[in-house]
Amino acid sequence: KGKTNNNLPNFKLGFDYTNSSNTGIHRQLGINFKAGNTFNYESGFDSETFDLQATDVYWNFPEIESNLIIAGVGELSAQLQIPLGFKIDTDKPVTLMIDEKDNMENYAIYLVDLLTGQIFNMKTPKILNLAKGTYEDRFILIFGGTALGVDDETLLNKIFVYSDNQNNEI
């Protein structure tokens, strides 16, 4: 059999932390972008996280009840928002980074903190200092770049609204 050529845009998101035994842990999430895929579970494109740790990261799509380690979503665009979930059981910082990026040469990846409105270009690792807890509605990844006509300045001028459902605040 011949080798298949996968030209789908995709990237691997890395997550580093130190566990309670003082061991460095690295989790990796994968995602690819293909026309016709959705945020619903699609066999062959999505895979659940079966070994969720006390401190961990996962794709957190509202349409799917389980947490994903691998996801296939629709086409890459400036409108696409990929929700991230974090489970934090440490007082130590955690680090998020792009481990690998394929067929996305004209795209930058940004982490958005919907609570603070901050936007971070993920071309360098991002250290997060989060209190213990679960974060499922706070962080998303968005995409920009020359192919989309979106630059850093445009992204910085976007307005994000965060709704805190527990405290009924915006």
What are the functions of these language-model segments?
Residues 1-170:
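Compositionally biased Ser/Thr/Gly- and acidic/asparagine-rich
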